[in-house]
């Protein structure tokens, strides 16, 4: 007899029966809605392993997961059969979560393939009859009508690549972000100076946001162009020159410190004496320990690209 680690005898009996292919096939032939049943090649039933879905999610369910090929033979359909011996007001949402997890796991092997259909089925034999709750997860919202409009339609899209710059600069405090990220792949950002000056003069960003913005420009370009960019920016904004130069200097200093740390890491990884490095740098034992953490592979040889 097959043993199952389950929370109740109900679950154990359910799994003993519904993990048997012939029993599962009969169950689906009898209980699947006709239009869905006709999509499935029930002769191709395959019981999926327990590792198919995240363990934390599986702990919420007493379920069985079968996969079947479609009748056209191209693609898969999954059937989740959930067992419940007492009602749960959020059962529909739980089944939706499980279905999403199955879809995610399916496409992890090949992100180009379409999402599979996942058919959740609930097997119920609780003391309260008939089953009292909707099995449409959209009915669980306080406003099901709005939920249907939201989740049955395409989600809102903010595609800055197609928004005219003249419109973007009217977007108040989010304008700087949208403008820079729209044009960041341009080799030369000097053409944006006029618009950036207008936005910065209107105090549409705080110091931390401007720091992040300038650092972003530096990281995605080169230092010479960055210095030219800063010079032109301060020329156009003499009243903000000190503020911008202070931020730019802070960015340069931070980059210099990180560069020094990277060099010391490389020295250690290539056999340099740790005591010698500690002596000439004056670093503490804790700082030396931090330096012993290996560089990510992509950073190890980045100097070759310069």
Curated annotation (Swiss-Prot):
Gene of this entry: rpnD
Domain of life: Bacteria
InterPro entries to which the protein is assigned, alphabetical: Rpn/YhgA-like_nuclease, RpnA, Transposase_31
Keywords for the protein's UniProt record, in alphabetical order: DNA recombination, Endonuclease, Hydrolase, Magnesium, Nuclease
Listed EC numbers: 3.1.21.-
One Pfam family named in its UniProt record: Transposase_31
Function noted in UniProt: A low activity DNA endonuclease yielding 3'-hydroxyl ends. Expression of a repaired protein increases the frequency of recA-independent recombination, but also decreases viability probably via DNA damage as measured by induction of the SOS repair response; in a RecA strain expression has no effect on viability but does induce the SOS repair response.
Originating organism: Escherichia coli O17:K52:H18 (strain UMN026 / ExPEC)
Gene Ontology MF terms in the entry: DNA endonuclease activity; double-stranded DNA endonuclease activity
One Gene Ontology term from the biological process aspect of the record: DNA recombination
Null allele phenotype: A quadruple rpnA-rpnB-rpnC-rpnD deletion shows no change in basal RecA-independent recombination.
Sequence similarity: Belongs to the Rpn/YhgA-like nuclease family.
The protein's name in its UniProt record: Recombination-promoting nuclease RpnD
């Amino acid at each position: 007899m097959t043993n199952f680690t389950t929370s109740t005898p109900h679950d154990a009996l359910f799994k003993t029966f519904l993990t048997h292919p012939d029993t599962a096939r009969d169950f689906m032939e009898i209980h699947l809605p006709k239009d869905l049943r006709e999509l499935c090649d029930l002769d191709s039933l395959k019981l999926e392993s327990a590792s198919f879905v995240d363990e934390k999610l599986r702990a919420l369910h007493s379920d069985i997961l079968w996969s079947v090929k479609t009748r056209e033979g191209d693609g898969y359909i999954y059937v989740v059969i959930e067992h419940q011996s007492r009602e749960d007001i959020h059962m529909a949402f739980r089944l939706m979560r499980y279905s999403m997890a199955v879809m995610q796991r399916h496409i992890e092997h090949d992100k180009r393939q379409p999402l599979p259909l996942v058919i959740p089925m609930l097997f119920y034999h609780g003391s309260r009859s008939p089953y009292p709750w909707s099995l449409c997860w959209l009915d669980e919202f306080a406003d099901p009508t709005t939920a249907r409009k939201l989740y049955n339609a395409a989600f809102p899209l903010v595609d800055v690549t197609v928004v005219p710059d003249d419109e973007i600069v009217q977007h108040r405090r989010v304008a700087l972000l949208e403008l820079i990220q729209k044009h960041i792949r341009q080799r030369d950002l000097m053409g944006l100076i006029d618009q950036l000056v207008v936005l910065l003069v209107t105090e549409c960003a705080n110091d931390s946001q401007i720091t992040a913005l300038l650092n972003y420009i530096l990281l995605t370009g080169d230092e010479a162009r960055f210095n030219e960019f800063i010079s032109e920016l301060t020329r156009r904004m003499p009243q903000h020159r000190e503020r911008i130069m202070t931020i730019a200097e802070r960015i340069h200093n931070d980059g210099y410190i990180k560069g020094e740390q990277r060099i010391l890491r490389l020295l250690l990884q290539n056999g340099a004496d740790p005591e010698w490095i500690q002596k000439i740098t004056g670093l503490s034992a804790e700082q030396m320990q931090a330096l012993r953490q290996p560089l990510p592979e992509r950073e190890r040889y980045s100097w070759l690209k310069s």
